[in-house]
Amino acid sequence: IPAGFDGFRIVQFSDVHLGTLVCPEAELSRIADSINSLHPDLVVFCGDLVNIRGSELDARAMRLLGGLRAPYGVVSVTGNHDAGVYIKDSIAHPAQASLAEVVARQREMGWRVLEDTTVYLRRGGDSISLTGLSFDPALRHLRHAPDLPPANLNAAYRGVPDSLYNITAVHIPQLWDQIAGEGYGDLTLSGHV
């Protein structure tokens, strides 16, 4: 990692599954307070904010999670529950509409959703790249498989210099071999497990 990022503090969390919380306000307050008490430079959320529907990310949850504070902000990627179909009435509540709702509400909270995108962070004259990989709904039925078919990583890493330190955020850890095989993911953050 470049010298300018020595001591750079990243707090990563994932798999909140809002629809499964028994006492959402208390649990989300505890999560937000814990994260903020660590004084992170950057917060990275690695997917599965909701369990079934985008509407689980309601005003109360948005207020609490929107209170996360870090100088470099909060970035996120989507997970299989954010992008998947886990209910019988998926015709009435299409997965794509729910995913769009989750992404829109995260942006409304001030989170930067990285959808197969790379951004650059600068500190002390040094730079690193931060790539976020969206959950591919085509992998929905393979989400727990140990090996995945080749993923198209080109768009996410397009133009990223090989020599630049790269942090990759991805929901499913099974993509690590492919990411590393492309020469990226010096640090890979994932959830799902």
Predicted segments, located by residue:
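Soluble catalytic domains of enzymes that build or remodel membrane lipids, polysaccharides, and related
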Residues: 4-193
